[in-house]
Amino acid sequence: MRISCLLACFCMLALFCACAAPEAALPEPPAAQVQSPEEPPAPVEPPVEPIIEEEPEPALLLSEPVWLLGRLTELYQADETQWAALADVLEAAKTLNADAQLEGLETVQFQGREYIPLAEAAQRLGLEWGEAPDGLRYLARRQTVGQIPEGWNVPVLMYHAVGDEIWGYSDLFVSEAGMEEQLRYLQENGYEPIWFSDLAHIEDYEKPVILTFDDGYDDNYTVLYPLLEKYQTKATIFVIGNAMGSQHKMTQEQVYELAASGLVSIQSHTYTHGNLSAMDEPALRQEMELSNAALAAATGQIPYVLCYPEGKYSHLTMDVAKDYYTFALRMDGWTYQTGMDP
């Protein structure tokens, strides 16, 4: 029995020990690995282009325009230099077949266009400065006429207005059909219409003839000019300087177009069509200088022939005219006489 009690006590003690013993610690799970987010790649910087500083545009100020070989051309000024658009100067130079003369000149950029110093360009092109009656300056070419051989007698055919609408003195008019008939006759019979400048090499022509038209009537542009083109005939038109754009007279633009055609030579019929034989020397010089200035501005060419209005002149007229012209013309009745001393 004692053994039973001991056994019971032992069992209870074992049970107590079992209850009192702490439970064995379970192993902790491994800590979760926290991954940091990947950083985006650094942006690739584009290559930095070197900064090229553009030259600032020159400070050009708009100046008064100038008549450049018959065309009104804008000018800009900086300090003492006047600049014209290179395209305008090149166009003028091409009419002289001298555009190569402008090579190497300094140019500047302004408002999207290229400009060239006008004074230096004019010098290279052999142009002369002057002041037109409208107060603007002009640049024009002086035509050099060679030595005229002596002993030649060249017929000069004188006309005025051409057309079928007669509004003035009828003897001044030739009809359109009549004008064409005469041009056709000259062509079919071997006559060669020339300009006064062609007299320097008159021996090159077998049957030379000069066609002149006085006063610069507007029908010289509307009626005569198409006929000259049709028959490829040269003519000389004597224009009154202050009459351009007036009633029945050609405009300055029409005069320019004729002068640029290669068929028409524009020459002087004085500035006011006054009576030269009654003028003193200052008045004569004013007539001739203003006439030349007006026509030089309109055409880009300085006249070298003078037609005395109504054929009136004096010895003083001839003396003064020699300072401005190579040829002068007067009428004997209805016949023209040429030469500085008719």
Which sequence ranges carry the predicted segments?
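C-terminal active-site subregion of NodB/CE4 polysaccharide deacetylases
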Residues: 143-212, 217-219, 278-342
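Short beta-strand and adjacent tight-turn residues that come in two discontinuous sequence segments
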Residues: 131, 238, 269, 330-331
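Substrate-binding clefts and substrate-entry loops adjacent to catalytic sites
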Residues: 267-282
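Short, well-structured secondary-structure segments
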Residues: 155-158, 192-196, 210-211, 229-245, ...
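C-terminal motif of bacterial Sec signal peptides marking the signal peptidase cleavage site
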Residues: 15-18
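Positively charged n-region of N-terminal signal peptides that target proteins for export
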Residues: 1-8
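Acidic (Asp/Glu)-rich catalytic clusters
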Residues: 187, 224-233, 249-268, 322, ...
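Primary recognition of N-terminal secretory signal peptides and signal-anchoring hydrophobic helices
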Residues: 23-152, 157
